Amino acid sequence: MSGSFSPCVVFTQMWLTLLVVTPVNGQHEAAQQSVVSLQPPWTTFFRGEVVTLTCYRFGFSVPQKTKWYQKRKTVKQTPGALVIKAHTLKVHESGEYWCQADSLLPSMHVNVEFSEDFLVLQAPPAVFEGDSVVLRCYAKKGIEAETLTFYKDGKALTLHPQSSEFYIHRANLKDNGQYKCTSKKKWSFGSLYTSNTVVVQVQELFPRPVLRARPSHPIDGSPVTLTCQTQLSAQKSDARLQFCFFRNLQLLGSGCSRSSEFHIPAIWTEESKRYQCKAETVNSQVSKQSTAFIIPVQRASARFQTHIIPASKLVFEGQLLLLNCSVKGVPGPLKFSWYKKDMLNKETKILKSSNAEFKISQVNISDAGEYYCEANNSRRSFVSRAFPITIKVPVSQPVLTLSTGKTQALEGDLMTLHCQSQRGSPCILYEFFYENVSLGNSSILSGGGAYFNFSMSTERSGNYYCTADNGLGAQCSEAIRISIFDMTKNRSVPMAAGITVGLLIMAVGVFLFYCWFSRKAGGKPTSDDSRNPSDSEPQEPTYYNVPACIELQPVYSNEPEENVIYTEVRRTQPRQKHADQESESPRSRCQMAEKK
């Protein structure tokens, strides 16, 4: 265990602290406490020598104000202790010393001893595993190295070559024990000098690390952070550690690093295996490994949320259809695919967030069907429940017709209105109107339109129309005007027509009778011997173109006892001399009663 280490290199600064530590990133950062250092880094000296104590703030910064203590009293300028600077104290008197930097907690106590013996064994105040330790056998006067002997627990230690320094490389628990040294007196035979006894107790530099996972129960595919937790000894808080992480004894990442954390972007159920970490000093003097730790990876449970615009899942042809899929409980990044039934539909998006949209600017009837989205995180696929999308065709302008085909009706007639849209998805609501007043409505689930029956009345004469609506908005038909006749108010019309026709018939009858009578009067009368004059009477010639009858007004009176004598009065007109007249006009005859 001998070597050629120089104590000035190994123990140039030995930081002695009494620290309260808190875990930070696996190592431990000292709380705000004061720190004391010794130079030279020993605790045993010969009387008359001087040791320098220096007080620092934690982190080895120079404090603004320092207080030194010995035996629970404040150290002032005394013959035994000389204050050189505010944070430095030179000591040549045995005792316990500590300091307080500014308002921090006091440092640990340092026990400094000044001996009057001829031979002393000098050792550092503390030994930690992995340290390179020097034990120096030191005499007041020069001694010959070949006369020195080191002992551990009463057993002599062999040094090659012989030296006044004993080296312990990579100190560990097997180096614990009681050490001392002896030397022969110069020019003396059989006389030995024996040093003081130093107890070496190798302290643990840091405990065995513990591996932690955050989160402790990760979800399949989610990121995980592994932390290798350990705690450096308070007096060795300036030691530098590095950390390594393993899965099934295979080194993770690019190797060991100063970070006590290792990030796994995604952990899967098949990787739920044995994990370990290792903490070691940068020079690999001390290395410790954690126990195996199995990370319980849970299967991901996808919770889908789908948002649809329009929210009713009922879309009219030509409208916008917007589908949005969001997933919780599944780690990303995710790739989203939209499916219609069993076939991939048009558009796929890859997003770092857990949202994806699928958009159809103008839907048509072929876009109807069941849709679902799929989220994939490169290892797992998660599928949402399918939801139906119904595409409706807006109704066209309806056509209003009459069953009779006539727009005129009599009061009391039964009328049937028929309203039908040639295009439109059911269910269609038809409504009938008279002069903007609703008459009734009907919902039709299939084609054929709707009918409305009503009995006409005088007040129902006017404009009729209908509307059709299947959810997008009502479409209005052209108006039909129906005229109504009231027979009780219009009898004068047929009566006047009847009278006119009757008068015409009577006029025609009178005219025909007149013609007949005139023709009858123009013929020769039947001979009557009793009434005709004798044949010897000269007869006046008769002419045509004379009035048929000239009424004579006789003056007579009837006496009851006398006989009535009928006379015939004949009037003749002179013959016209014009030769162009063809015949004689018939004689007019009028009969009258004459009194004798």
Swiss-Prot record:
Compartment list: Cell membrane
Extracellular topological segments: 27-496
Phenotype reported upon loss of the gene: Mating of knockout (KO) female and wild-type (WT) male results in 30% KO/WT pairs without fertilization output.
Tissue specificity of this protein: Preferentially expressed in marginal zone B cells.
Organism placement in taxonomy: Eukaryota, Metazoa, Chordata, Craniata, Vertebrata
UniProt keywords, alphabetically: Cell membrane, Disulfide bond, Fertilization, Glycoprotein, Immunoglobulin domain, Membrane, Phosphoprotein, Receptor, Repeat, Signal, Transmembrane, Transmembrane helix
Domain Ig-like C2-type: 34-115, 106-199, 207-294, 296-384, 398-483
Signal peptide limits: 1-26
Ranges of the Cytoplasmic topological domain: 518-596
Modification after translation: Phosphorylated on cytoplasmic tyrosines; required for interaction with protein tyrosine phosphatases and protein tyrosine kinases.
Record's function text: Plays an important role in B-cell response to antigen that acts both as a negative or positive coreceptor. Inhibits B-cell receptor (BCR) signaling in the absence of CR2 stimulation but engagement with CR2 and the BCR lead to a superior calcium response compared to CR2 and BCR costimulation. May be involved in B-cell development and differentiation in peripheral lymphoid organs and may be useful markers of B-cell stages. May have an immunoregulatory role in marginal zone B-cells. May play a role in fertilization.
InterPro entries associated with the record: Ig-like_dom (IPR007110), Ig-like_dom_sf (IPR036179), Ig-like_fold (IPR013783), Ig_Fc_receptor (IPR050488), Ig_sub (IPR003599), Ig_sub2 (IPR003598)
Top-level taxon in the UniProt lineage: Eukaryota
Membrane topology field: Single-pass type I membrane protein
Name by which UniProt lists this protein: Fc receptor-like protein 5
Disulfide bonds: 55-99, 137-181, 228-277, 325-373, 419-466
Transmembrane segments: 497-517
Biased composition regions of type Basic and acidic residues, renumbered to the chain: 577-596
